């Protein structure tokens, strides 16, 4: 039974094996197809990416190319503008250069024409044949004149060239006459440079206006610069023939042409120009006095050539001759300064003696001025400390007379009164030797007191005085107001009353010897001092009543002089109060 079962299984297995062999081949083929399709898709995607990238790059490159094209177009435009600018600048430069060259050529032609015109005038004055070279420049002379008159550079250079040609003509004349003499050349050159002559604007050259216009039509010859120079040399060689007066006339005419060519010349100033000629012009007639100049100087030549300037020349030449005749008076520019200095010196000499006298009069018042403002109020004790009270050493330093020899005692007081009465005229010149001085009016006679009245007054005042320090001050005022014939020094220290106080006080000299009778500053002080003493001291009321005769003497123009230090004594009194302590500023005993 088992054999029958195995046989069908083998047939089924064969069938399955044959079916399984076909499926993997199909699968492989299918896989290959899938792979190929994927490869194709990948390749297509890569190409699409590349195309997109290339498109972007192309767009960027196109933008850059457009910008570059714009820049190139701008650069091309700039290049065109620069080329146009350079061409325009070159054209402008060439035009300016041509204009300048034309102006220079016209000016040079005009100058040579005028130089030839001078030579032609010389030839006419000397009756010489005219030169053929002058006709070369006639074509452009009138046109160049119209151009050159308006240019300032032409006027400057023309004056230089005309002066140079004028100097050449003068040198040729001197070489003909003198030979190697050089000093007249320098003088003539100097004078020809400084000589000036005004010509009115109506002046026109006679030859030039008539000859220029027809020669412009006929002559058509171009003259180079070398021909101008050769013509100038030939004309200068031909100019060696004229004489000296002709050269003078030529110089005057060239200067007139110079003045004519300057348009800003004022024709209303002939007097001012003549004054300049009088001062600054050198002696133009020096050549006439040179011994090597035997030729005369006829004047009708220039007057014939210049008929319009005869009046001006007649005004200029006398001024120049007067300037040469009065050469030391007007030649010097600063000749007016020394009179000013002399006038100043004269004023100083007249004024200085007055100032010296005033200074000498002030010398005697120096000490009063120095102590003027100190004694203002005599009642204040603080001012007393400020006042200067020199000691005995300072008195010796300020005086040459011994103070002790000038003291007066009782026994020689009478002789001193007699001596004073005999020598009244000598008192004003003597210096005052003490603080209290009696100044007299010497023009009127005074009533004289006797010596008995003097002693009575002094005795009465001595009895009415107090026993304190006011005794000394009263003695001083009695000596002030006592007789006219009192001595210059009154003895104060050698009194019997003062001997009682010798133990308390050591007295010194009060003040130096100042002030004489001529001092006016101290004459106003006795009134102040008398008022101050009557107000501050009650003990002097009876003194004024008892001395009425002394007041009568005061009314007879007798001025008592007191120093400031005398009035300082009354500061001790105060307002009627007794002073306990006295300052040690008084004289000592002898």
Curated annotation (Swiss-Prot):
<dbReference type="GO" id="GO:0005634">
    <property type="term" value="C:nucleus"/>
</dbReference>
<dbReference type="Pfam" id="PF07558">
    <property type="entry name" value="Shugoshin_N"/>
</dbReference>
<keyword id="KW-0469">Meiosis</keyword>
<feature type="compositionally biased region" description="Polar residues">
    <location>
        <begin position="513"/>
        <end position="526"/>
    </location>
</feature>
<dbReference type="GO" id="GO:0070199">
    <property type="term" value="P:establishment of protein localization to chromosome"/>
</dbReference>
<feature type="region of interest" description="Disordered">
    <location>
        <begin position="411"/>
        <end position="550"/>
    </location>
</feature>
<dbReference type="Pfam" id="PF07557">
    <property type="entry name" value="Shugoshin_C"/>
</dbReference>
<keyword id="KW-0159">Chromosome partition</keyword>
<keyword id="KW-0963">Cytoplasm</keyword>
<feature type="compositionally biased region" description="Basic and acidic residues">
    <location>
        <begin position="173"/>
        <end position="185"/>
    </location>
</feature>
<keyword id="KW-0175">Coiled coil</keyword>
<dbReference type="GO" id="GO:0045184">
    <property type="term" value="P:establishment of protein localization"/>
</dbReference>
<dbReference type="GO" id="GO:0000922">
    <property type="term" value="C:spindle pole"/>
</dbReference>
<comment type="similarity">
    <text>Belongs to the shugoshin family.</text>
</comment>
<feature type="compositionally biased region" description="Low complexity">
    <location>
        <begin position="527"/>
        <end position="550"/>
    </location>
</feature>
<keyword id="KW-0137">Centromere</keyword>
<keyword id="KW-0158">Chromosome</keyword>
<keyword id="KW-0498">Mitosis</keyword>
<keyword id="KW-0832">Ubl conjugation</keyword>
<feature type="compositionally biased region" description="Low complexity">
    <location>
        <begin position="302"/>
        <end position="326"/>
    </location>
</feature>
<dbReference type="GO" id="GO:0000775">
    <property type="term" value="C:chromosome, centromeric region"/>
</dbReference>
<dbReference type="GO" id="GO:0000779">
    <property type="term" value="C:condensed chromosome, centromeric region"/>
</dbReference>
<feature type="region of interest" description="Disordered">
    <location>
        <begin position="291"/>
        <end position="337"/>
    </location>
</feature>
<dbReference type="GO" id="GO:0034096">
    <property type="term" value="P:positive regulation of maintenance of meiotic sister chromatid cohesion"/>
</dbReference>
<dbReference type="GO" id="GO:0051383">
    <property type="term" value="P:kinetochore organization"/>
</dbReference>
<dbReference type="InterPro" id="IPR011516">
    <property type="entry name" value="Shugoshin_N"/>
</dbReference>
<dbReference type="InterPro" id="IPR011515">
    <property type="entry name" value="Shugoshin_C"/>
</dbReference>
<dbReference type="GO" id="GO:0034090">
    <property type="term" value="P:maintenance of meiotic sister chromatid cohesion"/>
</dbReference>
<dbReference type="GO" id="GO:0051301">
    <property type="term" value="P:cell division"/>
</dbReference>
<dbReference type="GO" id="GO:0031134">
    <property type="term" value="P:sister chromatid biorientation"/>
</dbReference>
<feature type="compositionally biased region" description="Basic and acidic residues">
    <location>
        <begin position="448"/>
        <end position="459"/>
    </location>
</feature>
<dbReference type="GO" id="GO:0051757">
    <property type="term" value="P:meiotic sister chromatid separation"/>
</dbReference>
<feature type="region of interest" description="Disordered">
    <location>
        <begin position="133"/>
        <end position="235"/>
    </location>
</feature>
<feature type="compositionally biased region" description="Basic and acidic residues">
    <location>
        <begin position="11"/>
        <end position="20"/>
    </location>
</feature>
<dbReference type="GO" id="GO:0000278">
    <property type="term" value="P:mitotic cell cycle"/>
</dbReference>
<feature type="region of interest" description="Disordered">
    <location>
        <begin position="1"/>
        <end position="20"/>
    </location>
</feature>
<dbReference type="GO" id="GO:0000070">
    <property type="term" value="P:mitotic sister chromatid segregation"/>
</dbReference>
<dbReference type="GO" id="GO:0005737">
    <property type="term" value="C:cytoplasm"/>
</dbReference>
<keyword id="KW-0206">Cytoskeleton</keyword>
<keyword id="KW-0995">Kinetochore</keyword>
<keyword id="KW-0132">Cell division</keyword>
<dbReference type="GO" id="GO:0045144">
    <property type="term" value="P:meiotic sister chromatid segregation"/>
</dbReference>
């Amino acid at each position: 039974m088992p054999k029958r079962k195995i046989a069908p299984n083998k047939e089924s297995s064969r069938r399955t094996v044959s079916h399984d062999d076909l499926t993997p081949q199909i699968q492989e083929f299918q896989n290959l197809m899938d792979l190929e399709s994927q490869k194709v898709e990948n390749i297509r995607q890569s190409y699409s990416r590349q195309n997109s990238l290339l498109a972007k790059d192309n767009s960027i490159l196109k933008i850059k190319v457009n910008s570059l094209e714009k820049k190139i177009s701008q650069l091309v435009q700039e290049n065109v503008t620069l080329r146009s600018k350079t061409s325009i600048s070159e054209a402008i430069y060439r035009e300016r250069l041509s204009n300048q060259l034309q102006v220079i050529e016209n000016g040079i032609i005009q100058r040579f024409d005028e130089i030839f015109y001078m030579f032609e005038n010389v030839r006419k004055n000397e009756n010489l044949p005219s030169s053929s070279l002058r006709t070369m420049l006639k074509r452009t002379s009138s046109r160049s004149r119209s151009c050159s008159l308006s240019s300032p550079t032409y006027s400057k250079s023309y004056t230089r060239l005309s002066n140079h040609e004028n100097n050449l003509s003068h040198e040729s004349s001197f070489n003909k006459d003198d030979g190697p003499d050089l000093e007249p050349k320098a003088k003539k050159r100097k004078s020809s440079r400084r000589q000036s002559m005004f010509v009115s604007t109506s002046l026109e050259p006679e030859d030039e206006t008539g000859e220029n216009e027809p020669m412009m039509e006929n002559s058509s010859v171009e003259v180079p610069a070398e021909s101008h120079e050769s013509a100038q040399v030939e004309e200068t060689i031909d100019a060696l023939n004229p004489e000296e007066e002709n050269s003078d006339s030529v110089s005057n005419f060239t200067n007139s042409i110079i003045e004519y060519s300057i348009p800003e010349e004022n024709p209303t100033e002939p007097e001012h120009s003549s004054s300049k000629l009088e001062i600054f012009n050198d002696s133009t007639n020096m050549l006439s006095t040179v011994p090597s100049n035997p030729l005369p100087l006829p004047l009708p030549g220039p007057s014939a050539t210049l008929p319009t300037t005869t009046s001006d020349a007649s005004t200029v030449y006398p001024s120049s001759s007067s300037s040469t005749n009065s050469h030391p008076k007007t030649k010097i520019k600063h000749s007016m300064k020394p009179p000013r200095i002399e006038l100043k010196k004269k004023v100083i000499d007249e004024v200085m003696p007055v100032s010296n006298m005033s200074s000498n009069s002030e010398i005697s018042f120096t000490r009063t001025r120095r102590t003027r403002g100190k004694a203002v109020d005599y009642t204040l004790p603080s001012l007393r400390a400020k006042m200067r009270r020199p000691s005995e050493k300072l008195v010796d330093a300020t005086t040459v007379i011994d103070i002790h020899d000038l003291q007066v005692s009782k026994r020689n007081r009478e002789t001193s009164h007699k001596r004073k009465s005999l020598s009244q005229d000598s008192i004003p010149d003597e210096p005052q030797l003490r603080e209290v001085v009696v100044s007299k009016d010497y023009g009127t006679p005074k009533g004289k007191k006797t010596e008995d009245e003097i002693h009575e007054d002094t005795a009465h005042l001595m009895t009415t005085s107090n026993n304190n320090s006011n005794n000394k001050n009263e003695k001083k005022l009695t000596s002030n107001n006592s007789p006219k014939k009192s001595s210059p020094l009154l003895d104060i220290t050698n009194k019997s009353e003062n001997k009682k106080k010798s133990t308390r006080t050591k007295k010194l000299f009060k003040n130096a010897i100042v002030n004489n009778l001529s001092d006016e500053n101290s004459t106003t002080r006795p009134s102040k001092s008398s008022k101050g003493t009557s107000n501050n001291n009650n003990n002097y009321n009876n003194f004024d009543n008892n001395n009425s005769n002394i007041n009568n003497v005061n009314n007879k123009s007798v001025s008592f002089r007191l120093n400031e230090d005398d009035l300082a004594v009354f500061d001790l009194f105060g307002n009627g109060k007794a002073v306990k302590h006295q300052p040690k500023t008084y004289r000592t005993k002898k």
